[in-house]
Design a protein with these regions (language model features):
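Serine-dependent carboxylesterase/thioesterase catalytic core
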Residues: 51, 58-171
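Active-site catalytic motif of lipid deacylating hydrolases and related acyltransferases
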Residues: 1-92
Length: 171
């Protein structure tokens, strides 16, 4: 959760019970923000949500992705960007914890290289693709730091074989 979520006022993600890390860093003169992405969403959906917040636009999950996964193409509209001036001259330093690390890696990949499949699907549908899917904006990120991120998967299934087998049989 992030600063746009209600729970953040009670228990900020960065700092939780010890106080807000973003407030602490702000008091020290650092400009910090906590983006809000879906807690149970895919890395793709979360990357699209992060882009929309940084750009101050409507979340566009992509024509192809929405068709492939059976959900709406558009999500929340962010009328104001998380901060003004995001771009090459004002690049961000991303910090992602846990699945946020995987999310920010995918975000940077799409921001840098785009998604040709989404561009083609949008154009075939006669609509404009999101600027996010066009790529060419890798310089808009100065750095990416991942903390305890599952970049190489997880050992959960191996460690919980009986549990996962039972869950699969119930499905």
């Amino acid at each position: 959760w992030g600063q746009r979520d209600r729970i953040y006022r009670i228990m900020p993600y960065w700092g939780m019970t010890t106080g807000s890390l973003t407030d602490y860093l702000s008091a020290k003169g650092y400009e910090t923000y906590a983006a809000s992405v879906g807690p149970l969403s895919s890395a793709w959906d979360r990357a699209c949500e992060l882009y929309a917040q940084l750009a101050g636009t409507r979340t566009d999950y992509g024509v192809k992705h929405a068709q492939d996964f059976g959900h709406e193409r558009y999500g929340i509209e962010y009328k104001q960007p998380l901060f003004d001036g995001w771009g090459t001259e004002r690049a961000v330093n991303l910090v992602g914890h846990s699945f946020g690390g995987a999310t920010t890696r995918l975000f940077l990949e799409i921001l840098t290289n785009g998604c040709p499949e989404e561009v083609a699907a949008a154009r075939a549908a006669g609509v404009e693709p999101s600027p996010f899917f066009l790529g060419g904006k890798g310089s808009w990120v100065h750095s990416l730091t991942a903390i305890a991120a599952p970049h190489n998967g997880t050992s959960f299934i191996e460690c919980n074989a009986d549990f996962t087998k039972a869950a699969a049989e119930l499905a």
